[in-house]
Protein backbone atom coordinates (compact mmCIF):
# COMPACT_ATOMS: atom_id res chain seq x y z
CA UNK A 1 0.00 0.00 0.00
CA UNK A 2 2.77 2.42 0.93
CA UNK A 3 4.65 1.56 -2.27
CA UNK A 4 1.49 2.25 -4.32
CA UNK A 5 0.99 5.65 -2.64
CA UNK A 6 4.62 6.56 -3.27
CA UNK A 7 4.34 5.64 -6.95
CA UNK A 8 1.09 7.59 -7.24
CA UNK A 9 2.76 10.64 -5.72
CA UNK A 10 5.62 10.40 -8.21
CA UNK A 11 3.18 10.14 -11.13
CA UNK A 12 1.20 13.16 -9.92
CA UNK A 13 4.41 15.15 -9.51
CA UNK A 14 5.45 14.30 -13.06
CA UNK A 15 2.05 15.32 -14.42
CA UNK A 16 2.25 18.60 -12.51
CA UNK A 17 5.61 19.38 -14.06
CA UNK A 18 4.33 18.63 -17.57
CA UNK A 19 1.19 20.76 -17.23
CA UNK A 20 1.01 24.43 -16.33
CA UNK A 21 -1.89 26.75 -15.66
CA UNK A 22 -3.00 29.48 -18.04
CA UNK A 23 -5.91 31.88 -17.97
CA UNK A 24 -8.92 31.21 -20.17
CA UNK A 25 -8.51 34.69 -21.70
CA UNK A 26 -5.10 33.63 -23.06
CA UNK A 27 -6.52 30.48 -24.62
CA UNK A 28 -9.79 31.74 -26.11
CA UNK A 29 -11.57 34.66 -27.72
CA UNK A 30 -15.23 35.66 -27.63
CA UNK A 31 -17.06 34.80 -30.82
CA UNK A 32 -18.23 37.94 -32.62
CA UNK A 33 -15.82 40.23 -30.78
CA UNK A 34 -13.32 40.92 -33.54
CA UNK A 35 -11.73 43.60 -35.68
CA UNK A 36 -12.98 44.66 -39.12
CA UNK A 37 -10.84 45.85 -42.01
CA UNK A 38 -11.18 49.33 -43.50
CA UNK A 39 -9.65 50.62 -46.73
CA UNK A 40 -9.45 53.93 -48.56
CA UNK A 41 -7.71 55.73 -51.41
CA UNK A 42 -6.12 59.12 -50.92
CA UNK A 43 -3.35 61.57 -51.69
CA UNK A 44 -0.15 62.39 -49.86
CA UNK A 45 1.26 65.89 -50.37
CA UNK A 46 4.33 67.76 -49.14
CA UNK A 47 6.90 65.27 -50.43
CA UNK A 48 10.38 66.59 -51.12
CA UNK A 49 10.44 65.78 -54.83
CA UNK A 50 9.94 62.05 -54.16
CA UNK A 51 6.32 61.75 -55.25
CA UNK A 52 4.71 60.07 -58.25
CA UNK A 53 5.80 60.89 -61.77
CA UNK A 54 2.39 62.09 -62.86
CA UNK A 55 3.10 61.43 -66.54
CA UNK A 56 3.37 57.72 -65.68
CA UNK A 57 0.61 57.59 -63.05
CA UNK A 58 -2.43 59.31 -64.59
CA UNK A 59 -4.67 58.32 -61.67
CA UNK A 60 -2.66 60.65 -59.41
CA UNK A 61 -3.40 63.63 -61.65
CA UNK A 62 -7.05 62.62 -62.00
CA UNK A 63 -7.47 62.36 -58.23
CA UNK A 64 -5.80 65.73 -57.70
CA UNK A 65 -8.09 67.37 -60.27
CA UNK A 66 -11.18 65.91 -58.57
CA UNK A 67 -10.01 67.10 -55.15
CA UNK A 68 -9.26 70.62 -56.41
CA UNK A 69 -12.66 70.72 -58.12
CA UNK A 70 -14.39 69.88 -54.82
CA UNK A 71 -12.45 72.73 -53.20
CA UNK A 72 -13.71 75.15 -55.85
CA UNK A 73 -10.52 75.30 -57.91
CA UNK A 74 -10.82 74.64 -61.65
CA UNK A 75 -7.79 73.38 -63.54
CA UNK A 76 -7.80 74.48 -67.21
CA UNK A 77 -8.55 71.66 -69.63
CA UNK A 78 -5.45 70.20 -71.25
CA UNK A 79 -3.10 71.36 -68.52
CA UNK A 80 -0.14 69.01 -68.19
CA UNK A 81 0.70 69.05 -64.51
CA UNK A 82 4.13 67.59 -63.84
CA UNK A 83 4.15 67.29 -60.07
CA UNK A 84 6.78 65.71 -57.85
CA UNK A 85 5.40 66.35 -54.38
CA UNK A 86 2.16 64.32 -54.61
CA UNK A 87 1.64 60.55 -54.34
CA UNK A 88 -1.41 58.32 -54.63
CA UNK A 89 -1.70 55.94 -51.68
CA UNK A 90 -3.86 53.19 -50.24
CA UNK A 91 -4.87 53.63 -46.61
CA UNK A 92 -5.77 50.65 -44.42
CA UNK A 93 -6.92 50.38 -40.82
CA UNK A 94 -8.51 47.94 -38.39
CA UNK A 95 -11.87 48.86 -36.87
CA UNK A 96 -11.66 47.62 -33.26
CA UNK A 97 -14.56 45.88 -31.52
CA UNK A 98 -16.96 48.12 -29.57
CA UNK A 99 -15.48 51.25 -31.21
CA UNK A 100 -17.40 54.46 -30.51
CA UNK A 101 -17.86 57.61 -32.54
CA UNK A 102 -14.95 60.01 -32.04
CA UNK A 103 -12.47 57.29 -31.10
CA UNK A 104 -9.12 57.39 -32.93
CA UNK A 105 -7.35 54.46 -34.58
CA UNK A 106 -3.99 53.95 -36.30
CA UNK A 107 -3.74 53.81 -40.09
CA UNK A 108 -1.16 52.38 -42.49
CA UNK A 109 -0.33 54.35 -45.65
CA UNK A 110 1.20 52.57 -48.68
CA UNK A 111 2.23 54.06 -52.01
CA UNK A 112 0.52 52.62 -55.09
CA UNK A 113 2.37 54.65 -57.74
CA UNK A 114 6.08 55.11 -58.44
CA UNK A 115 6.85 57.48 -55.59
CA UNK A 116 10.38 57.12 -54.23
CA UNK A 117 9.55 57.98 -50.63
CA UNK A 118 6.65 59.09 -48.43
CA UNK A 119 8.93 60.63 -45.81
CA UNK A 120 7.73 64.06 -44.71
CA UNK A 121 4.37 63.69 -46.45
CA UNK A 122 0.91 64.54 -45.17
CA UNK A 123 -2.13 62.41 -45.90
CA UNK A 124 -5.13 64.47 -46.95
CA UNK A 125 -8.61 63.65 -45.66
CA UNK A 126 -9.37 60.09 -46.78
CA UNK A 127 -12.65 58.23 -46.15
CA UNK A 128 -12.16 54.66 -44.95
CA UNK A 129 -14.82 52.17 -46.04
CA UNK A 130 -15.81 48.67 -45.02
CA UNK A 131 -16.86 45.75 -47.19
CA UNK A 132 -20.37 47.24 -47.34
CA UNK A 133 -18.98 50.43 -48.99
CA UNK A 134 -20.06 52.52 -45.99
CA UNK A 135 -17.67 55.15 -44.62
CA UNK A 136 -16.71 54.31 -41.04
CA UNK A 137 -13.71 56.58 -40.43
CA UNK A 138 -11.82 59.59 -41.80
CA UNK A 139 -8.02 59.55 -41.94
CA UNK A 140 -5.64 62.50 -42.13
CA UNK A 141 -2.28 63.46 -40.69
CA UNK A 142 1.50 63.42 -41.00
CA UNK A 143 3.09 60.13 -42.00
CA UNK A 144 5.85 58.53 -39.95
CA UNK A 145 8.20 56.51 -42.18
CA UNK A 146 10.64 54.16 -40.47
CA UNK A 147 13.09 53.88 -43.37
CA UNK A 148 15.78 56.23 -44.60
CA UNK A 149 17.57 56.58 -47.92
CA UNK A 150 19.96 58.80 -49.86
CA UNK A 151 21.23 58.98 -53.43
CA UNK A 152 23.89 60.98 -55.27
CA UNK A 153 25.93 60.58 -58.43
CA UNK A 154 24.08 57.49 -59.56
CA UNK A 155 24.63 55.65 -56.25
CA UNK A 156 21.98 55.12 -53.61
CA UNK A 157 21.57 53.54 -50.20
CA UNK A 158 18.34 52.62 -48.44
CA UNK A 159 17.49 51.21 -45.03
CA UNK A 160 14.06 49.67 -44.54
CA UNK A 161 10.98 50.60 -46.56
CA UNK A 162 10.34 54.17 -47.72
CA UNK A 163 7.08 53.65 -49.63
CA UNK A 164 4.97 52.90 -46.58
CA UNK A 165 4.33 54.57 -43.27
CA UNK A 166 2.01 54.83 -40.31
CA UNK A 167 -0.09 57.55 -38.71
CA UNK A 168 -0.70 56.97 -35.03
CA UNK A 169 -4.28 57.90 -34.12
CA UNK A 170 -4.60 59.09 -37.70
CA UNK A 171 -8.27 58.22 -38.24
CA UNK A 172 -11.43 59.19 -36.37
CA UNK A 173 -14.39 56.80 -36.10
CA UNK A 174 -17.46 58.41 -37.66
CA UNK A 175 -19.88 55.47 -37.75
CA UNK A 176 -20.47 52.77 -35.14
CA UNK A 177 -20.97 49.13 -35.98
CA UNK A 178 -24.06 47.45 -34.51
CA UNK A 179 -23.23 44.67 -32.05
CA UNK A 180 -25.19 41.69 -30.80
CA UNK A 181 -23.30 41.54 -27.52
CA UNK A 182 -25.71 41.26 -24.60
CA UNK A 183 -28.68 40.29 -26.77
CA UNK A 184 -28.67 36.53 -26.14
CA UNK A 185 -28.35 34.17 -23.20
CA UNK A 186 -25.31 32.30 -24.52
CA UNK A 187 -21.80 33.29 -25.57
CA UNK A 188 -19.37 31.12 -27.50
CA UNK A 189 -15.71 31.00 -26.52
CA UNK A 190 -13.44 30.11 -29.44
CA UNK A 191 -10.17 28.33 -28.67
CA UNK A 192 -7.08 29.70 -30.37
CA UNK A 193 -6.14 26.14 -31.39
CA UNK A 194 -8.52 23.25 -31.84
CA UNK A 195 -8.07 20.78 -29.00
CA UNK A 196 -10.76 18.46 -27.63
CA UNK A 197 -8.91 18.04 -24.34
CA UNK A 198 -8.53 21.76 -23.79
CA UNK A 199 -12.17 22.43 -24.73
CA UNK A 200 -13.32 19.90 -22.14
CA UNK A 201 -10.98 21.26 -19.46
CA UNK A 202 -12.31 24.79 -19.98
CA UNK A 203 -15.86 23.45 -19.81
CA UNK A 204 -15.15 21.58 -16.57
CA UNK A 205 -13.47 24.63 -15.00
CA UNK A 206 -16.47 26.87 -15.77
CA UNK A 207 -18.95 24.26 -14.53
CA UNK A 208 -17.06 23.82 -11.27
CA UNK A 209 -17.11 27.57 -10.65
CA UNK A 210 -20.58 28.43 -12.00
CA UNK A 211 -22.52 25.23 -11.61
CA UNK A 212 -23.15 22.21 -13.79
CA UNK A 213 -24.64 23.08 -17.17
CA UNK A 214 -23.11 26.55 -17.33
CA UNK A 215 -20.76 25.53 -20.15
CA UNK A 216 -20.88 22.97 -22.94
CA UNK A 217 -18.12 21.98 -25.35
CA UNK A 218 -19.66 22.06 -28.83
CA UNK A 219 -16.53 20.88 -30.64
CA UNK A 220 -12.73 21.04 -30.45
CA UNK A 221 -12.72 24.83 -30.85
CA UNK A 222 -16.00 26.13 -29.39
CA UNK A 223 -17.28 26.23 -25.80
CA UNK A 224 -20.79 27.59 -25.31
CA UNK A 225 -21.42 29.40 -22.01
CA UNK A 226 -24.80 30.32 -20.55
CA UNK A 227 -24.70 33.94 -19.38
CA UNK A 228 -27.16 36.26 -17.63
CA UNK A 229 -29.09 38.73 -19.75
CA UNK A 230 -27.98 42.35 -20.05
CA UNK A 231 -24.72 43.94 -21.12
CA UNK A 232 -23.42 44.84 -17.67
CA UNK A 233 -24.17 41.38 -16.26
CA UNK A 234 -22.46 39.67 -19.17
CA UNK A 235 -19.41 41.91 -18.86
CA UNK A 236 -18.97 40.96 -15.19
CA UNK A 237 -19.65 37.29 -15.95
CA UNK A 238 -17.07 37.18 -18.76
CA UNK A 239 -14.51 39.05 -16.65
CA UNK A 240 -14.74 36.33 -13.99
CA UNK A 241 -14.60 33.48 -16.50
CA UNK A 242 -11.65 34.84 -18.47
CA UNK A 243 -9.53 35.10 -15.33
CA UNK A 244 -10.07 31.42 -14.44
CA UNK A 245 -7.02 29.20 -14.81
CA UNK A 246 -6.92 25.77 -16.42
CA UNK A 247 -4.09 23.26 -16.63
CA UNK A 248 -2.56 23.19 -20.10
CA UNK A 249 -1.43 19.74 -21.20
CA UNK A 250 1.64 19.31 -23.42
CA UNK A 251 1.00 20.45 -26.96
CA UNK A 252 1.24 18.27 -30.05
CA UNK A 253 4.73 17.71 -31.39
CA UNK A 254 5.09 19.86 -34.51
CA UNK A 255 7.80 20.96 -36.91
CA UNK A 256 7.09 24.04 -39.06
CA UNK A 257 9.13 24.60 -42.23
CA UNK A 258 9.08 27.88 -44.15
CA UNK A 259 9.84 26.85 -47.72
CA UNK A 260 10.49 30.45 -48.81
CA UNK A 261 13.10 31.38 -46.21
CA UNK A 262 14.40 27.93 -45.30
CA UNK A 263 13.72 28.40 -41.58
CA UNK A 264 12.84 25.36 -39.45
CA UNK A 265 11.04 25.71 -36.10
CA UNK A 266 10.09 22.87 -33.76
CA UNK A 267 8.53 22.74 -30.31
CA UNK A 268 9.85 20.90 -27.29
CA UNK A 269 7.62 17.85 -27.78
CA UNK A 270 9.50 16.73 -30.92
CA UNK A 271 11.39 13.45 -30.55
CA UNK A 272 13.45 11.27 -32.89
CA UNK A 273 13.90 7.53 -33.29
CA UNK A 274 17.22 6.03 -34.33
CA UNK A 275 17.85 6.16 -38.07
CA UNK A 276 20.59 6.52 -40.69
CA UNK A 277 20.72 9.49 -43.06
CA UNK A 278 22.70 10.01 -46.28
CA UNK A 279 22.53 13.47 -47.81
CA UNK A 280 24.53 14.23 -50.95
CA UNK A 281 25.26 17.67 -52.36
CA UNK A 282 24.77 18.22 -56.08
CA UNK A 283 26.27 21.39 -57.55
CA UNK A 284 25.98 22.65 -61.12
CA UNK A 285 28.32 25.39 -62.36
CA UNK A 286 27.60 27.16 -65.64
CA UNK A 287 30.37 29.35 -67.07
CA UNK A 288 29.57 31.38 -70.20
CA UNK A 289 32.09 33.49 -72.08
CA UNK A 290 31.71 35.61 -75.22
CA UNK A 291 34.56 35.28 -77.74
CA UNK A 292 35.07 37.95 -80.40
CA UNK A 293 36.37 36.60 -83.75
CA UNK A 294 37.79 39.11 -86.21
CA UNK A 295 39.18 38.58 -89.75
CA UNK A 296 42.95 38.08 -89.92
CA UNK A 297 43.53 40.46 -92.84
CA UNK A 298 42.30 44.05 -92.71
CA UNK A 299 39.94 45.15 -95.45
CA UNK A 300 39.46 41.51 -96.45
CA UNK A 301 35.70 41.80 -96.45
CA UNK A 302 35.21 39.61 -93.38
CA UNK A 303 32.88 40.36 -90.46
CA UNK A 304 33.47 40.40 -86.75
CA UNK A 305 31.48 37.58 -85.10
CA UNK A 306 30.70 37.10 -81.40
CA UNK A 307 30.50 33.41 -80.47
CA UNK A 308 29.41 32.27 -77.00
CA UNK A 309 31.34 29.50 -75.26
CA UNK A 310 29.52 27.70 -72.46
CA UNK A 311 31.02 25.22 -69.99
CA UNK A 312 28.89 23.20 -67.58
CA UNK A 313 30.44 21.46 -64.58
CA UNK A 314 28.43 18.92 -62.56
CA UNK A 315 29.74 17.75 -59.21
CA UNK A 316 28.28 15.54 -56.52
CA UNK A 317 29.80 15.22 -53.06
CA UNK A 318 28.94 13.60 -49.77
CA UNK A 319 26.33 10.91 -49.54
CA UNK A 320 27.80 8.77 -46.76
CA UNK A 321 25.43 7.28 -44.21
CA UNK A 322 25.37 9.01 -40.83
CA UNK A 323 23.71 7.64 -37.74
CA UNK A 324 21.10 9.72 -35.91
CA UNK A 325 20.54 8.62 -32.33
CA UNK A 326 17.19 8.40 -30.65
CA UNK A 327 16.40 11.73 -28.98
CA UNK A 328 13.85 12.14 -26.20
CA UNK A 329 13.92 15.92 -25.76
CA UNK A 330 14.41 19.08 -27.81
CA UNK A 331 18.06 19.60 -26.86
CA UNK A 332 18.92 16.08 -27.94
CA UNK A 333 17.05 16.57 -31.22
CA UNK A 334 18.99 19.77 -31.94
CA UNK A 335 22.33 18.10 -31.22
CA UNK A 336 21.44 15.09 -33.38
CA UNK A 337 20.41 17.24 -36.35
CA UNK A 338 23.41 19.56 -36.01
CA UNK A 339 25.68 16.53 -36.11
CA UNK A 340 24.56 15.93 -39.70
CA UNK A 341 26.12 19.24 -40.76
CA UNK A 342 23.23 19.94 -43.13
CA UNK A 343 22.18 23.37 -44.34
CA UNK A 344 18.65 24.59 -43.54
CA UNK A 345 17.50 23.77 -47.08
CA UNK A 346 18.94 20.24 -46.78
CA UNK A 347 17.39 19.91 -43.34
CA UNK A 348 13.95 20.46 -44.84
CA UNK A 349 14.35 17.42 -47.10
CA UNK A 350 15.88 15.36 -44.29
CA UNK A 351 12.98 16.05 -41.93
CA UNK A 352 10.44 15.15 -44.61
CA UNK A 353 12.25 11.87 -45.27
CA UNK A 354 12.50 11.16 -41.54
CA UNK A 355 8.77 11.57 -41.14
CA UNK A 356 8.09 9.28 -44.10
CA UNK A 357 10.38 6.67 -42.54
CA UNK A 358 8.61 6.99 -39.18
CA UNK A 359 11.67 8.35 -37.37
CA UNK A 360 10.33 11.87 -36.75
CA UNK A 361 7.71 11.79 -34.02
CA UNK A 362 5.96 15.04 -34.92
CA UNK A 363 3.55 16.66 -37.32
CA UNK A 364 5.28 18.33 -40.25
CA UNK A 365 3.78 21.60 -41.49
CA UNK A 366 5.14 23.45 -44.52
CA UNK A 367 4.16 27.10 -44.92
Curated annotation (Swiss-Prot):
One of its GO terms (biological process) is bacterial-type flagellum-dependent cell motility. GO terms for cellular component: bacterial-type flagellum basal body, distal rod, P ring; outer membrane-bounded periplasmic space. InterPro entries: Flag_FlgI (IPR001782). GO terms for molecular function: structural molecule activity. Pfam families: FlgI. It is found in: Periplasm; Bacterial flagellum basal body. The keyword Electron transport does not apply. The keyword Signal applies. Residues 1-21 form the signal peptide. Keywords: Bacterial flagellum, Periplasm, Signal. PANTHER family: FLAGELLAR P-RING PERIPLASMIC PROTEIN FLGI, FLAGELLAR P-RING PROTEIN. The basal body constitutes a major portion of the flagellar organelle and consists of four rings (L,P,S, and M) mounted on a central rod. Assembles around the rod to form the L-ring and probably protects the motor/basal body from shearing forces during rotation. Belongs to the FlgI family. This is Flagellar P-ring protein. The lineage of its organism: Bacteria, Pseudomonadati, Pseudomonadota, Gammaproteobacteria, Enterobacterales.
Amino acid sequence: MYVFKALAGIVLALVATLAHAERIRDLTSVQGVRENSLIGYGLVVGLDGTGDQTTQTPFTTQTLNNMLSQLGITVPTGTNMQLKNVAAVMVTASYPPFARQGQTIDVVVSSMGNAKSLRGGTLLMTPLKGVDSQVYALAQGNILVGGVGASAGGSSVQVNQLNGGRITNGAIIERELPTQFGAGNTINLQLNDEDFTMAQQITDAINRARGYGSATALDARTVQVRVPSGNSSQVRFLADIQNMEVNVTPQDAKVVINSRTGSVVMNREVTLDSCAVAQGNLSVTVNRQLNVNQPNTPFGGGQTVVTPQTQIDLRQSGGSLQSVRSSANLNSVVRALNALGATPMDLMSILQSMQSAGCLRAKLEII
